[in-house]
Amino acid sequence: GVVIEQGVRLGPGCSLGHHAVIHAGTQLGAACRVEDHAVLGRLPRPAPTSTVKVPPTLPPLRIGDRSSIGTGAVVYAGSVVGSQCLIGDLTFVREQVHIGDRVIVGTHVTVENEVSIGNGVKIQTGAYITAWTTIEENCFIAPCVVTTNDNYMGRTDRRFKERGGAVIRRGARVGANVTLLPNIEIGAEAFVAAGAVVT
């Protein structure tokens, strides 16, 4: 059966699939669809050795009107998903993520914490969007794109000052299997060819 915790707000016309879990305080707009086994509004539980510190409290997850959450997707508390969005099957959206309106986040995509995604963005199957990435409006992110945020790969304290994800400016297109190294900026309307490594 479906689990709906205390303080959840479901807009008119919402539908919930089998075994969906809606955590406390989560807010869904009108006519949202939540597919089977999706989990909405869960709290992050980092490993004891994690260097990413989670705030002691997070605001509830908010999802706009007519958005769809796929089967097995997990969307954390503290995030905002706009109207008319699609979060694909088996996709993970971490805490403190802001997703604009009319965004497609495809199947099996990971969006890490503190990411900003503008209106009209399309992120295709299997992409990895690392923490602290910004994707401006109307960008296209092809399948299996990988973004990174730590040039030191977990070594030395310098990484804490210098880590940061890519900034992908308005209307840019990033081809399949592209790898973007930390702190890269892709210009407005730029095109990055498939398989490129941008350093």
Predicted regions and their residues:
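Structural signal for interior beta-strand "rungs" in well-ordered beta-sheet cores
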Residues: 2-199
